[in-house]
A protein has these predicted regions:
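Short hydrophobic core segments
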Residues: 8-10, 182, 188-201, 343
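Dinucleotide-binding Rossmann-like beta1-alpha1 core, especially the glycine-rich loop
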Residues: 46-122, 243-245
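Helix-loop-beta segment of a Rossmann-like dinucleotide-binding subdomain
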Residues: 79-87, 107, 113-116, 120-151, ...
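Helical element adjacent to the flavin cofactor pocket in flavoenzyme catalytic cores
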Residues: 134-192
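C-terminal catalytic lobe of FAD-dependent flavoproteins
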Residues: 289-383
Length: 383
């Protein structure tokens, strides 16, 4: 590989920033973003890191992310706060979830099944009376998404990467079935490789070259102030049957998110949480947490991300695509936590070096069709 090979990255969200940081020491990297860095889905993310529960079937993927966040903690203003996470188990799921915990704990993952009595002793703020117990994941955590992305950008810049904001990219330039650059608002940009990390917009951008099965969906977050600040031992978690996940804030507030649905008009989607979601949260939270009967409202927001048919991203150089193109999209709300994995995967695809984890879960040929007409699966409803 020539040290001067040029890589153009389409998209300045957390994935684009992570890719730029990974490649900048060896490549001439330029990132093109139509707005501001980390200005859309990244800034609106909840910042949860639950990679081991998301990839229990491929633990090397989960551990790669966890180890990165542990090592990156303290870089610039970035911090990674580790907390356990719990998933509520309904009575009809008890046998299945006990078996799940036994299987993966035997494989060395920090996963346990706690019956409702044990869970109540460990997490006394919760009311588990309607549940058989919880699945406890011992390794998870959270971070501030915007700070993370900007720290990645700063590292990339220090290694020579350039970032071009307010610069829409209009077309992928291809000659003789090879990528040669991009057409942007500022004119033509020559490149030896292009990494498309444009979120839900990736499908339309690449449709003439390689269709990708990605569709937009909208997700929401609300922050509440409980009657007393949450304690240091308060966990992250999710309530699958109610389509929500939650975590504490550093100041003792409570963030709850989810209520995700496919979005047919992403450019016009509201940035505010729906009234239906606000009411759902108001009704639901006091049923499983103490101290929220008179909780105060702090903030809410909503954002649009890209989904794939199986909820896992596409990190691949598709065989039917022009040579030199790498696709990194469809993170289903897990872009923040998957960013270190995505960056390593993209580097592997460019250099042909073997990745330190399986790449099969991210290959585009795992799908039978490239259509975007598929049923959206909400990860907040299924975890």
């Amino acid at each position: 590989m020539a040290m001067s090979e040029r890589v153009a990255v389409v998209g300045g969200g957390v994935i684009g920033c992570a890719v730029a940081r990974e490649l900048a020491p060896e490549y001439d990297v330029a990132v093109y973003e139509k707005g501001q860095i980390a200005g859309e889905a990244t800034a609106l993310a909840a910042g949860e890191v639950t990679m081991l529960s998301s990839y229990e079937d491929y633990p090397d993927i989960g551990w790669h992310a966890v180890e990165f966040f542990r090592e990156y903690d303290g870089t610039g203003n970035f911090t990674f706060t580790e907390l356990p996470s719990i998933g509520f188990v309904s009575p009809d799921q008890e046998a299945e979830k006990r078996e799940y915990a036994e299987q993966f704990s035997a494989d060395g993952l920090p996963i346990s099944y706690l019956d409702s009595e044990t869970a109540s002793e460990r997490y006394p703020t919760f009311d588990f009376s309607d549940h058989a117990g919880v699945i406890e994941h011992g390794v998870s955590g959270f971070l501030d998404p915007y700070t993370f992305a900007i720290t990645l950008q700063n590292d990339a810049r220090a290694d020579g990467a350039t970032f071009h904001t307010d610069t829409p990219v209009h077309d992928l330039l291809v000659e003789d079935d090879e990528v040669v650059g991009l057409e942007t608002d500022d004119g033509r940009v020559d490149a030896d490789h292009v990494v498309c990390a444009a979120g839900w917009r990736t499908r339309e951008f690449l449709l003439d070259h390689t269709p990708v099965p990605v569709r937009p969906y909208r997700t929401q977050c609300i922050v509440l102030e409980p009657e007393e600040p949450l304690s240091d031992g308060f966990p992250m978690g999710w309530y699958p049957g109610e389509h929500v996940y939650f975590r504490p804030e550093h100041n003792g507030d409570f963030l709850i998110g989810g209520w995700s649905f496919a979005e047919n008009e992403p450019e016009h989607a509201s940035n505010d949480a729906d009234e239906a979601f606000r009411q759902h949260v108001a009704d639901l939270v006091p049923t499983f947490l103490e101290g929220f009967e008179r909780a105060g409202y702090v903030d809410d927001w909503a954002g649009v991300d890209g989904a794939t048919p199986d909820t896992r991203p596409i990190l691949d150089a598709p065989s039917d695509a022009p040579d030199g193109l790498v696709v990194a999209t469809g993170f289903n709300g897990r872009g923040i936590m998957t960013a270190p994995v995505a960056a390593t995967a993209v580097r592997s695809l460019l250099t042909d070096d073997e990745a330190p984890f399986p790449m099969e879960p991210f290959a585009i040929d795992r799908f039978d069709t490239r259509s975007d007409d598929f049923e959206f699966i909400s990860i907040s409803a299924s975890e």
